[in-house]
């Protein structure tokens, strides 16, 4: 995509989203936007717009390798969080630091006990596990399922 180009989600991207989020996100309103190069990789500044900067947004994330699709899911997690009332800018400030994205699974720990970046990482890991390409460093599918509040879309 070119700088400032903006688009809706493709059918394949909607399918990716449903693997983790079911029907919890109004996908009709989600947009992908390419920003000019900046020090951030991607962000969700306007609740339903995912802005890519450091790297290029794919024309269709369903046509890229599983790892890139999983990062798309990470960004969709922020759209989902915003839909649930999370003020992303404030929550991001609380989630700053070298270990902002790292998490350790613990029995009984709920998703809300993790910061927004850890939640998005759990969504990313869950996506990979559900499609049969688990991250070897991530918790098992069973453990991820225990933490994630949305059951898999049928």
Which role does the model predict for each range below?
Residues 1-3:
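A short, surface-exposed helix-loop junction/capping segment
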Residues 70-82:
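Active-site recognition of the HExxH zinc-binding catalytic motif
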Residues 6-31, 45-49, 83-154:
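Metalloprotease/metallohydrolase-associated module, dominated by Zn2+-dependent proteases
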Residues 35-39, 56-58, 77, 85-87, ...:
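Short, solvent-exposed loop/turn segments at secondary-structure junctions
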Residues 40-42, 52-73, 110-112:
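Short pre-active-site segment immediately N-terminal to the catalytic Zn-binding motif
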């Amino acid at each position: 995509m070119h700088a400032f180009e903006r688009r809706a989600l493709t059918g394949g991207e909607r399918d990716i989203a449903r693997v983790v989020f079911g029907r919890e996100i109004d996908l009709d309103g989600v947009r992908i936007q390419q920003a000019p190069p900046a020090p951030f990789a991607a962000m969700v500044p306007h609740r339903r717009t995912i802005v890519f900067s450091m790297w290029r947004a794919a024309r269709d994330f369903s046509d890229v390798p599983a790892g890139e699709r999983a990062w798309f899911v990470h960004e969709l997690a922020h759209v989902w969080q915003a839909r649930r009332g999370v003020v992303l800018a404030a929550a991001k400030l609380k989630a700053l630091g070298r270990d902002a994205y790292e998490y350790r699974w613990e029995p009984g720990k709920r998703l809300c006990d993790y910061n927004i970046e850890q939640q998005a990482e759990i969504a990313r890991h869950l996506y990979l596990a559900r499609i049969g390409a688990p991250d070897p460093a991530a918790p098992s599918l069973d453990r991820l399922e225990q933490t994630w509040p949305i059951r898999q879309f049928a």
